[in-house]
Amino acid sequence: MATGKAQKKDKLRHAEYYDFQEIQDKLYADSSKGKVFKHLVEIIALPENIRLAYRNIKKNHGSMTPGTDGKTITELATLSDEQLISSVQHKLDWYVPQSVRRVEIPKGNDPTKKRPLGIPTIMDRLIQQCVLQVMEPICEAKFHDHSYGFRPNRNQQHAIAQVHKDMQRSNLHYVVDIDIKGFFDNVNHGKLLKQLWTMGIHDKKLLCILSAMLKAEVAGIGFPEVGTPQGGIISPLLSNVVLNELDWWLASQWEEIPTEFPYKETVNPNGSVSKSHKFSALRRTKLKEVTCVRYADDFKIFTNSYQNAVKLFHATKSWLHERLALEISPEKSKVINLKEQYSEFLGFKLKVIPRGRRSDGRTKYVVESHIREKSIAKIKPNLKRLIYDIEFPSQGKRTEYQAICRYNVYVMGIHDYYQLATKVCDDLTPFALSVHKSLRARLKERVKTAKQVRKRKLPCEVPKVIRERYGKSKQLRYVAGHAVVPVGYIRHKPPKSMNRKINSYTPEGRAEIHKNLDRIDMTVLHYLMRNPVLYRTIEYNDNRLSLYSAQMGKCAVSGKVLSIGDIHCHHKVPRYLGGKDNYQNLVLVCEDVHHLIHATNPDIIRKYMEILGLDVPDCLWATYRFPAVLCSHVSFRLSVRQATSRVIMRNSTNNLQCKMPYLGARTCHRYRK
């Protein structure tokens, strides 16, 4: 999980890379204007869209999970560009999906309960990704603003922030908790297709393809008549389409209700529209004040009185049954007074407590939130298991260093997510002592305190991210010279509301995204920690983390944001020339830059320089038709921190001096534009 991070850019960057962004922008703009779409399959079958889909799914860990045909992304990788495109286009002509592999995973802490997952074949997943990339901008323009699950640039933190706002600022202290019984397994296919038609998707061929996806055979069970398979790439989008109608129905009861007088609306700094004047007028009427916050199928309906909450409970129950053919779980659905009871949402439990007086003399209530008991019950055994892996790394099929990395990543992930709870320190402190005792009991003298390390001058390696976040903690421990993140060292961080200006499908919205690129993506950093490069030194893997933090998550040459799968660690002085794995000799670059550094063929060099937007004077190419000749005679005089450096390239007959970003040995004359 990421904290204070830039939004995930992988799909956005890939769309720009394959020149598909303009098409998605137009789909979004047309959908916002209420236009209908009749020829979407032609867009889905475009080579650019298919290439983009392949790039997006190949980076997922799930791409290595086989379907019923036993194939993974590895098999697709063996196909040529033309073969892959023609295969997808041929399947789209008359789409018949292969059977779906059914897998059951544990549901919650109850071992008797299982959650069924449907895993399509890798080719069907690729086609679903192609469809998703075209449908998503159309649907995004129609979705309600208070829906946060499975949508680009939105996450759990934004949903929690909206809940805080409704409870604390809007003083809506009664909540209707509704749990839909088996939502994903009971979606009505006919109703879903009609909802897509209402959204403007009038391409009958696409609707037939979607119907075929929904009715794909489940191996060993048969053909489903209802439900969307959990595990399919397109299922989250379709689930949002189903419940989008509920979002707008609830909004029509209060937020979107028309008024005779056009009240003034102002735009907040985060891009949201303030309707405070309209709401003030509505509160003077007998209308029921109601707002809804939804994350996937988990949603909260807030109101200002118990009577209104009871009415909304029964109205919503009837609406779900009549409109969407969905039933609620009577055991889990209820009305809660937030002044007296906690309400659970996204792993937290929340209520309001009195805290002073407001300006009008009334009692002021603020949000108090904890980690819910079920979530805490999962954390402790997981930590004990990770400590066991550190004690016996060979039994866990990983090295001691890898086991420590996995432990640290897990603890930092807990901190990153649950720091949104106001009482997170109180929740984690009780078993932080238990975890510390477990470390001491299992690892014994292998565990050292920071004081012992300093006093005995023991060698230790602390990645920059751990040093910055936990360096001042007395709870920090060391095992074999590696820092072990303390569980109890955490403080509350208020949830940050979503910036409504951000939008992946408008130029202005993408400009807002790019403003945030100077912050580090903790998800990528966690990935690097969790996946050290095997058969490389510990110094090498630790320096990867330090470099990612020091370079602000960007390529040292192009300045592009580095994403999982696109991070290459380059030795400035090659190892075969005596280069070491020390920090000064390493630099993180993207894949294209790394290919350019090691390229020797002039055509390949030109290709990558065009991709990266670099320029070489014509006179240079005229003089040196084959720059590979020069590559073996390159020496450098520069500093790592400098944006450019002077490079002296020598051969037997010519000397040339030019400025270039510092890359290292085998680098030819590269120029920035």
Please place each PLM-identified region on the residue numbering.
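Conserved polymerase palm-domain catalytic core
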Residues: 142-146, 151, 158-328, 335, ...
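Extended C-terminal regions of large enzymes
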Residues: 443-535, 638-640, 648
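Short cysteine-rich loop/turn motifs with clustered Cys
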Residues: 537-568, 590-592
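Conserved pre-catalytic core of RNA-dependent polymerases
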Residues: 12-233, 237
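Histidine-centered nuclease catalytic patch
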Residues: 179, 559-591, 599-609
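A conserved non-catalytic segment of reverse transcriptases
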Residues: 215, 220, 324-396, 403, ...
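Non-catalytic, peripheral interaction segments enriched in hydrophobic/basic residues
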Residues: 401-466
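Polybasic, low-complexity binding patches
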Residues: 576-584, 596-637, 652
